[in-house]
């Protein structure tokens, strides 16, 4: 699934974060007390998200908490555009859930495929291009829109 979405999958012992725009590193060791992420996702050599993989048939209930713990456990020597990491996946290979912490009200949603590295890069760059200091997504930008005045009342 990751390879089909454009990710290069590597083991932690042979990781080369510059091998491609999107690199998924297996069994990535996090800070003490945070365990190992099944996959840590890097875009342009910067950590952006985590994946917790479960066996087919296992429930994903409660796994979102595990990925949230992983998202705050990135060792400081690894660059990340945002901490805690904003993109969290839980997957059995059949069922996949995704939480985008750039959303103003983040929550896990079922998705049918992993996002491509370019999609993450676009989301992280969107507001930087617009001159806003905080990355965001459409829902956040829509909430920041000014109130429209009703010009009909002034005719």
Please give the residue ranges for each predicted region:
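ATP-dependent helicase/translocase motor core
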Residues: 1-155
């Amino acid at each position: 699934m990751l390879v089909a979405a454009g990710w290069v999958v590597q083991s932690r012992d042979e990781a080369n974060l510059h091998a491609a725009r999107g690199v998924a590193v297996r069994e990535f060791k996090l800070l003490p007390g945070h365990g190992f992420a099944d996959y840590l996702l890097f875009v342009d050599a910067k950590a952006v998200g985590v994946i917790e993989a479960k066996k087919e048939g296992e429930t994903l209930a409660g796994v979102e908490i595990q990925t949230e713990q992983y998202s705050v456990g990135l060792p400081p020597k690894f660059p990340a555009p945002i901490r805690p990491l904003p993109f969290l996946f839980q997957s059995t290979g059949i069922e996949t859930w995704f939480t985008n912490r750039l959303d103003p009200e983040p929550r896990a949603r079922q998705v049918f495929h992993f996002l491509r590295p370019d999609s993450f890069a676009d989301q992280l760059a969107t507001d930087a291009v617009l001159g806003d200091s905080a990355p965001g997504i459409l829902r956040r930008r829509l909430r920041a829109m000014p109130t429209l005045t009703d010009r009909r009342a002034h005719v």
